[in-house]
Swiss-Prot record:
NCBIfam families: PRK08881.1. Keywords: Mitochondrion, Ribonucleoprotein, Ribosomal protein. The keyword Ribosomal protein applies. GO terms for cellular component: mitochondrion; ribonucleoprotein complex; ribosome. It is found in: Mitochondrion. Pfam families: Ribosomal_S14. Its main location: mitochondrion. Belongs to the universal ribosomal protein uS14 family. GO terms for biological process: translation. GO terms for molecular function: structural constituent of ribosome. This is Small ribosomal subunit protein uS14m. It comes from the Eukaryota.
């Protein structure tokens, strides 16, 4: 199940990167009050015709080993329990249990 979710998320990331500039351009045209309203409406229509998954709002950080969407470290892209297990085994370079 996690492979399916991770592959779906990966496809969304690729689509979002592909359409990022076009989406930002259309949004800027829509929000510009100096442009005529028909031109803004035309760009709003073009924005609505872009693929749904091309928005970064639909991208979700997921654990690369379990596919879990919550409590995932952005830097390592690992769920906190998996991170703890890998760190305690010494599988993550430079990570050790803190003590003071």
């Amino acid at each position: 199940m996690s492979e399916k979710q991770n592959s779906r998320d990966h496809k969304r990331r690729l689509l979002a990167a592909k359409f990022e500039l076009r989406r930002k351009l259309y949004k800027a045209f829509c929000k510009d009050p100096d442009l005529p309203s028909d031109m803004r409406d035309k760009h709003r229509y073009k924005l609505s015709k872009l693929p749904r998954n091309s928005s970064f709002a639909r991208v979700r950080n997921r654990c690369i080993s379990t596919g879990r969407p919550r409590s995932v470290s952005e830097f390592f892209r690992i769920y906190r329990i998996v991170f703890r297990g890998l760190a305690s085994r010494g599988s993550l370079m430079g990570i050790k249990k803190s003590s003071w």
